[in-house]
Amino acid sequence: MNLTQYLQHISQNNHSPESVNMTLTAWIDILGATMLGRAPQFADTYREKHLSNGISGLRELMGCDDRVMYLISEIACLEALKNDGMLSDIDLCDHVKSLAHQIDLTEPSLDQPVATPPIITADGQIDTRQLTNTTTDAFRFAARIYLCSLVPGFDRHQPQVMELLNKLTHCLESIPAGPDGFDRSLVWVYLIGGSVATSGSLFMRFFKSRCSALGEAGACGSFGRMTRILGILWGKREDGWEGGWRDVMEGNSWDFLLI
């Protein structure tokens, strides 16, 4: 059972089929837009909900806090403007700074415990609250990396980027692994992290260990497609190529939805 199925199962009495469908639509719309470098179809709705602290049920059903998902939508909108040549470098950097501050506001409050409790409790049960907290943290780190990639002159070797990737890796280490774990529900997170990983990085070693733990399941579905993209990307970069993951997809005529 993946993360989405698990959360849907334990919250099925709290959500009508209509609300579940709307939540799934928002999830696909937002992350699907990042696949294409364009604005989500319902970006205005997410923006209004973000400004009014509206809830879409994304945390309860998909594992990531609504506010972080709304900001990923905003980053996708910013990328669309960049791709269309609608912003000067100065304006683009100003928007990046503004969104980075908005992401800061979604961080846990300072009065919360510093030590992170384990997702699997002493009696072998899953702490659902900690699972969604950690999932949100992972998406937040990935969102920061995605946002940084829009800065003119972006270089994945920059210390700030490498630090973010290491933080993401340490966050993912606490997510249960293997066929019964939740890695296959974090495809987008792994894609964004892997897109900036450098040869010999902690992330690469960690990712390969997670793929090994998944066994045959790691070659299936969105996770398997994501591993193929990263494998090609990393291999080409070893030969000096500096393209991105979208270039790999376009070069192979792939139009995967990796969520």
What are these model-predicted stretches?
Residues 2-5, 238-239:
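Secondary-structure junction/capping motif
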Residues 25, 56, 239:
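Noncatalytic carbohydrate-binding groove/subsite architecture in carbohydrate-active enzymes
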Residues 16-23, 120-127, 225-234:
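TPR/TPR-like alpha-solenoid helical repeat scaffolds
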Residues 3, 10-37, 62:
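Aromatic- and glycine-enriched pocket-lining scaffold segments that form the walls
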Residues 9-16, 38-187, 192-211, 215-216:
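Cytosolic regulatory protein-protein interaction regions
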Residues 25, 36, 62-66, 72, ...:
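A cross-taxonomic marker for long C-terminal extensions/tails that follow the last structured domain
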Residues 200, 209-259:
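Intrinsically disordered, low-complexity regulatory regions with latent secondary structure
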